[in-house]
């Protein structure tokens, strides 16, 4: 399985999936046949999470091939990412609290052997060990496997969900603050309070085609408890009527200018914003940073090929731009911070 960092390759992957595999998606999507056999799922999330292709584009193309009735499950899965972004955007303190808790837990668990065994793939669980290695090597995991992984981390290994979410963010090509953080909260039972997700031996065996044996899990754990509640915070954004001749900021989660509402406007300059590890609260692996770098450079080249004045700059350099700017706002997470 290979993720080539360009919009052209992303569109090719989307078209190939729709033409060849979408018809069987609803029936086969829960099966993880291993990293060498991913034809039953789209593997588009590393591109969607960076805006290289967006959710509307994916849905529109799928509906040109199949009716909504035949396509409903795929569309639902695509829209979960949109839902999570909207949910967290209206509750930004969930992200801020997560980072605060994470800082405390890092210090508490930096020498914890159970934690070190988990992130190094040295537990007694064959399936978990393989998934750790797969995550580090391919920077991707099947969605069903992510749920099993998180459940084992929280309820069998009894490790804090916050550290597990960080581990995913560090290594996943498609990691984003909303889907990742809220997904881990959901498994733990604090996103939908009292409702958690418990991995089970029979379920893992069934949906991995019996690739793993002797899966001894805690299948009777209770949900985690959080007394925190979050109120909605209304966000005010201005959509200026006249945006020509202004500078545009594009962050790493909205990289494809050609599919934005601004594609026909004439900007003075477009700045593609890159976020290095030294500016991030959660440090990413070198492979993930490299993937983001190549995606950003691909978009830069596309803009230049269309004679658009553009430049890649570090997020810390935004303050040096003195002319008027507008932005494809980053919604949530590291870029918004």
Feature names for model-found ranges:
Residues 1-76, 80, 86, 90-106, ...:
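Trp/Phe/Arg-rich N-terminal binding region typifying the photolyase-homology
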Residues 48, 53-56, 61, 67-243:
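Active-site-proximal binding-pocket segments
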């Amino acid at each position: 399985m290979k993720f080539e960092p360009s919009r052209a390759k992303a569109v090719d992957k989307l078209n190939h999936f729709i033409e060849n595999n979408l018809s069987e998606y609803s029936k086969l999507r829960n099966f993880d046949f291993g990293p060498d056999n991913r034809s039953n799922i789209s593997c588009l999330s590393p591109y969607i999470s960076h805006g290289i292709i967006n959710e509307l584009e994916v849905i529109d193309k799928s509906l040109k091939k199949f009716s909504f009735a035949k396509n409903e499950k795929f569309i639902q899965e695509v829209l979960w990412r949109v839902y999570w972004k909207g949910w967290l955007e209206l509750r930004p303190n969930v992200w801020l609290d997560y980072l605060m808790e994470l800082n405390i837990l890092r210090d508490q668990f930096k020498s914890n052997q159970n934690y070190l065994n988990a992130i190094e793939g040295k537990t007694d669980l064959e399936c978990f060990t393989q998934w750790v290695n797969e995550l580090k090597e391919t920077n991707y995991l099947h969605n069903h496997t992510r749920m099993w992984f998180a459940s084992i981390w929280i309820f069998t290994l009894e490790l804090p969900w916050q550290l597990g979410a960080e581990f995913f963010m560090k290594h996943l090509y498609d990691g984003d603050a909303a889907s990742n953080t809220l997904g881990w909260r959901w498994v733990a039972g604090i996103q939908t309070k009292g409702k958690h997700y418990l991995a089970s031996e029979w379920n893992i065996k069934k949906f991995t085609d019996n690739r793993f044996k002797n899966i001894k899990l805690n299948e009777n754990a209770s949900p985690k408890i959080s007394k925190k509640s979050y109120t909605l915070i209304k966000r005010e954004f201005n959509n200026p009527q006249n945006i020509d001749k202004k500078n545009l900021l594009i962050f790493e989660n909205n990289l494809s200018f050609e599919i934005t509402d601004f594609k026909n406007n004439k900007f003075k300059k477009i700045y593609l914003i890159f976020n290095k590890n030294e500016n991030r609260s959660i440090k990413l692996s070198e492979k993930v940073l490299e993937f983001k770098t190549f995606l950003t450079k691909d978009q830069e080249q596309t803009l230049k090929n269309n004679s658009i004045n553009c430049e890649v700059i570090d997020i810390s350099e935004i303050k040096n731009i003195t002319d008027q700017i507008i932005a494809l706002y980053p919604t949530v997470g590291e870029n918004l911070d």
